[in-house]
């Protein structure tokens, strides 16, 4: 007969009328009993003949995507001019005195951040924007391009101008200026002798081919005088000839063009174009070396133009033939839905490409992307704004995957010890936190996004793909992309974007200048950054509490007035560092703080309400006696695991589910097991703050017996049959708790000390978790453990009771980082009369 829920409760000793603990509890460690119960509850039955269930409520398998909804009305969020101050360390020193080693190390990590994976896969530009919304292809394309353009304008992306140069907006950092080689102007130098120059004037030498060899030439040229190629690498110095170059030929003086797809293009410049007189440079553009490459994977026509810094070339200068959009102007409409109708709507479509305020040399950057992008809702509560999702998952896959650095996240108990207090709280919202942290330009070639331009994008997605050999020469080919759908979409988009339709229809390649969200390194860097800043704030205001997890920063103070003055001081400090706060999203929590999915107050910690609603819903939808796909079980365990510490039996109750997931087997909920779990989760208990104290109760065990020292009293007992040592120690701790009621127990067993009871026999783990809930353990070496003798059956010998103090841990968050001594010449910081009447230190 299957085990009923009532019997099961009794078995786990969750009822009050259980027999004496010393007899009942060791039974739960019995292997036979555990097997019988598992069979009764149908827990370990991997061979299932019925098909698996792949959906439970909102939970589908981990890898099956919930279909995202496209919103044509999405607003692109605006990004403030985010520029984290480069002298952040000095500013912090002014604020709080010398920094600790930890703070220094963490702030250096992000100034600038570096990311150099061993292997980077380059994907064709067509994969730049993911066809995530097949019904709204064109709309999604333009919204994504607009989002990328906004990020570039805000200084978050670099724009690849050529193989070795990029441009960007916003304030440059010193490590970018080091690479700038005189910004847009390349001044030729007279180093290494003049042999290679044309006799008349300083100029640029002809190059027969430009290819990957450029780096080796740059290396060679540092070694001293070189024939012919040496000039290229000289740092700009002296010389008055200044030459400005556009798009593909990099502004660092190469007159060759390297198209992205095909090997090398050999352009031998004629002598007239290679020896340029200074006057000619100032008045005229280059002799027209222009290779119109049709649509290679970068799709740019390459021209060299003389253009003053910051000017965008208007389309009249450019070769109209090279621009897919403007070609429609001169062509006859092919139908009423021809794109030429749209192109003829306005006279000036603006530039084919825009250039940033600053230009910079980069390592070799191919005309490819390394990750795709698409748009989704900003968050479940805000569907009016979009968020850009960047898929750089290539760095987390395969043999060459990058193993991301691990970082400490406080566990629930540490968090409670830290934040559970009678303080008033508020939380700050850092806007676009990831985009605060600058990346070194050398990382740009690994983090490329972009698109191959509208014509390729539309052609690739139309059912009869018409790009054959990438020939877009003839008018017939041009009109192949005209269709009613495209026409209607573009007409609607014209109202939103106007002349920018032309700009966005061109191919573009962008690299990240600040850390992107889709790389495993970013959360680590953000956590290091905010924790260092909070550490500085904590030391500056020792009577308050500042704490952060990723971009979530909370401040606590003893009274509301004090909190407001702290808020003002901290906000000014953060703004002075260049950190952007969103004042509308500052939340004042009163005495119960909402943080990391928990509600934390003076009584302890509790899961937030929406999470409680989630698992109530989950239990309502959970099918009984039907095998559930282990991937769905992963989702269920993820949700239930979050709230497990608040239940009677904790994590051990979920062990059967964990075992199934590890074995990649379907799991079947029996009515009793489901009833047991749902009852566990209907009654939650807060996790309380641990208090410091003096340990008076000690437990110890041998495989055959147990002993306790409670104050001056000693007790001992034996087990019916020998038990594994960890199991025996756990039983001894349970007896100590139930006999003395003490919530501070000394033990010499590291497994009991860790309070992780998932590796014990299942029934014992569940029961022990309930008995030892809220107990703190202190480590006592065996040689000093007063319970050691009783456990070996010797009651007569008394070891003196230890005075073992217990300090609750706050994980790796050091609240008391002692400030390094302040040099005497610094004036004392002004002390304002604190609104605290009592000297108070954080818990």
Curated annotation (Swiss-Prot):
The record marks 63 as: Priming of reverse-transcription by covalently linking the first nucleotide of the (-)DNA. GO terms for molecular function: DNA binding; DNA-directed DNA polymerase activity; metal ion binding; RNA-directed DNA polymerase activity; RNA-DNA hybrid ribonuclease activity. The keyword Metal-binding applies. Mg(2+) binds at residues 429, 551-552. Its EC number is 2.7.7.7, 2.7.7.49, 3.1.26.4. Residues 290-299 have a biased composition (Polar residues). Residues 1-177 are annotated as: Terminal protein domain (TP). InterPro entries: DNA/RNA_pol_sf, DNApol_viral_C, DNApol_viral_N, HBV_DPOL, Rev_trsase/Diguanyl_cyclase, RT_dom, Viral_Replic_Matur_Polypro. The keyword Oxidoreductase does not apply. Residues 219-249, 290-316 are annotated as: Disordered. Keywords: DNA replication, DNA-binding, DNA-directed DNA polymerase, Endonuclease, Host-virus interaction, Hydrolase, Inhibition of host innate immune response by virus, Inhibition of host RLR pathway by virus, Magnesium, Metal-binding, Multifunctional enzyme, Nuclease, Nucleotidyltransferase, RNA-directed DNA polymerase, Transferase, Viral immunoevasion. It comes from the Viruses. Activated by host HSP70 and HSP40 in vitro to be able to bind the epsilon loop of the pgRNA. Because deletion of the RNase H region renders the protein partly chaperone-independent, the chaperones may be needed indirectly to relieve occlusion of the RNA-binding site by this domain. Inhibited by several reverse-transcriptase inhibitors: Lamivudine, Adefovir and Entecavir. Residues 178-346 are annotated as: Spacer. Residues 347-690 are annotated as: Polymerase/reverse transcriptase domain (RT). Residues 357-600 form the Reverse transcriptase domain. Hepadnaviral virions contain probably just one P protein molecule per particle. HAMAP family: HBV_DPOL. Belongs to the hepadnaviridae P protein family. Multifunctional enzyme that converts the viral RNA genome into dsDNA in viral cytoplasmic capsids. This enzyme displays a DNA polymerase activity that can copy either DNA or RNA templates, and a ribonuclease H (RNase H) activity that cleaves the RNA strand of RNA-DNA heteroduplexes in a partially processive 3'- to 5'-endonucleasic mode. Neo-synthesized pregenomic RNA (pgRNA) are encapsidated together with the P protein, and reverse-transcribed inside the nucleocapsid. Terminal protein domain (TP) is hepadnavirus-specific. Spacer domain is highly variable and separates the TP and RT domains. Polymerase/reverse-transcriptase domain (RT) and ribonuclease H domain (RH) are similar to retrovirus reverse transcriptase/RNase H. This is Protein P. The lineage of its organism: Viruses, Riboviria, Pararnavirae, Artverviricota, Revtraviricetes.
